C-alpha cells in the first residue's frame, strides 16, 4: 500500500510518501510545497499553490490513501483559521482525486513514531530517519508528513487485525455479531 502524508501549512506544506508491505516501510519521496514567494495578502493564490502542488504529488506518486494532520487550536485565532484554510485546500486536492483521507493529531503522530506524544521536532526527524533507513535527516515539515504516513500505516494494520478478529469471533456460536452492539 502506498500512503501519502501531509503536514499542512500556509507558508510551507510538507509531504511524504511511503510504501507499506507487511511490516516493511519503504521511503518513496518527500518534500515541501512553498508559498513563500507570494505576499501574505495573496491568500487565494497561496491556497491554489497548495491545491495544485498536492494534486501534482498525487499524480506523480499515485498513493492509495492519505493522512493529514488535524489542526490544533492556536493561541492566535487568525493563525488557526489560516492554517485551517491551508488544510482544506490540501484535503480538497486529495478527495478530488478520490483518495481516502485519514486524520491524526500531532500528538497521535508523535506517539506512533517516537513513542512519546510530546516529542520535539528533532526527535521526530531522527525516528523517521531510523524507521525509513534514510541516509540523513529529512526537513522538519517533510519529517512530520512522513510521520503521518507511518502513523496511518500502523493504524491501518491495527484496524485490519481488529476486522480479522471480528470475523473470527463472529463466525463462532452465533452469539457475537459484528457491527452495532445492542
UniProtKB/Swiss-Prot annotation:
Binds 2 Mg(2+) ion per subunit. Its EC number is 3.1.21.10. Mg(2+) 2 binds at residue 69. Its cofactor is Mg(2+). Transmembrane segments: none annotated. It is an enzyme of class 3 (hydrolase). It comes from the Bacteria. The keyword Magnesium applies. HAMAP family: RuvC (MF_00034). This is Crossover junction endodeoxyribonuclease RuvC. It comes from Albidiferax ferrireducens (strain ATCC BAA-621 / DSM 15236 / T118) (Rhodoferax ferrireducens). The gene is ruvC.
Amino acid at each position: 500500500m502506498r500512503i501519502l502524508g501531509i503536514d499542512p501549512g500556509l507558508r510551507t506544506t510538507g509531504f511524504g510518501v511511503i510504501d507499506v508491505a507487511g511490516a516493511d516501510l519503504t521511503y518513496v519521496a518527500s518534500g515541501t510545497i512553498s508559498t513563500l514567494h507570494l505576499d501574505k495578502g495573496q491568500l487565494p493564490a497561496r491556497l491554489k499553490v497548495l491545491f495544485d502542488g498536492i494534486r501534482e504529488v498525487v499524480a506523480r506518486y499515485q498513493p492509495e490513501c492519505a493522512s493529514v494532520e488535524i489542526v490544533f487550536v492556536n493561541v492566535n485565532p487568525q493563525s488557526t483559521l489560516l492554517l485551517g484554510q491551508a488544510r482544506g485546500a490540501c484535503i480538497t486536492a486529495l478527495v478530488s482525486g478520490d483518495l481516502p483521507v485519514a486524520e491524526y493529531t500531532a500528538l497521535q503522530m508523535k506517539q506512533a513514531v517516537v513513542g512519546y506524544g510530546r516529542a520535539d521536532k528533532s526527535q521526530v526527524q531522527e525516528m523517521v530517519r531510523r524507521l525509513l533507513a534514510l541516509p540523513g535527516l529529512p526537513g522538519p515539515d517533510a519529517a512530520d508528513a512522513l510521520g503521518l504516513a507511518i502513523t496511518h500505516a500502523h493504524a491501518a494494520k491495527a484496524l485490519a487485525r481488529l476486522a480479522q478478529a471480528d470475523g473470527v469471533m463472529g463466525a463462532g456460536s452465533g452469539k457475537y455479531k459484528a457491527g452495532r452492539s445492542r
